[in-house]
Amino acid sequence: MQRTMLKSKLHRVHVTHSELDYEGSCAIDEALLEAADIKEYQQIDIYNVNNGERFTTYAIRAERNSGIISVNGAAARKASPGDLLIIATYASYTEAELAQFKPQLVYVDADNRIKNQRQHIPVQAA
């Protein structure tokens, strides 16, 4: 049996650009792609914290250390500059692979610079 698990997450990145006429996808600062182990052209799910939109697209590379998060093409109608996004990828793992499984979680500041990286989400308490 395989289980689909959260593989990587960019948590609360800020949209810097929204380009309706650009060829689709989401451009992401190359340093963030590497930190989260997201490959160029990999499928990503985007969750817009500001308006609740959830959509799927693919990642493309933006200039390293630029802080760019640009939502492009038709998806530009789902996010505006300044919106907070969660960008996630998922992968399927066998039970044996799950023994070594750890997601790559990347947390950023207001300028989309890495401030913290973890491999677990803290337990939610009452």
Curated annotation (Swiss-Prot):
Post-translational modification: Is synthesized initially as an inactive proenzyme, which is activated by self-cleavage at a specific serine bond to produce a beta-subunit with a hydroxyl group at its C-terminus and an alpha-subunit with a pyruvoyl group at its N-terminus.
CDD domains according to UniProt: Asp_decarbox
Ligand binding (substrate): T57, G73, A74, A75
Stretches of the chain forming a coiled coil according to its record: none
Role summary: Catalyzes the pyruvoyl-dependent decarboxylation of aspartate to produce beta-alanine.
Self-association state and partner proteins as the record states: Heterooctamer of four alpha and four beta subunits.
HAMAP family: PanD
Protein name: Aspartate 1-decarboxylase
Native organism: Methylobacillus flagellatus (strain ATCC 51484 / DSM 6875 / VKM B-1610 / KT)
Gene: panD
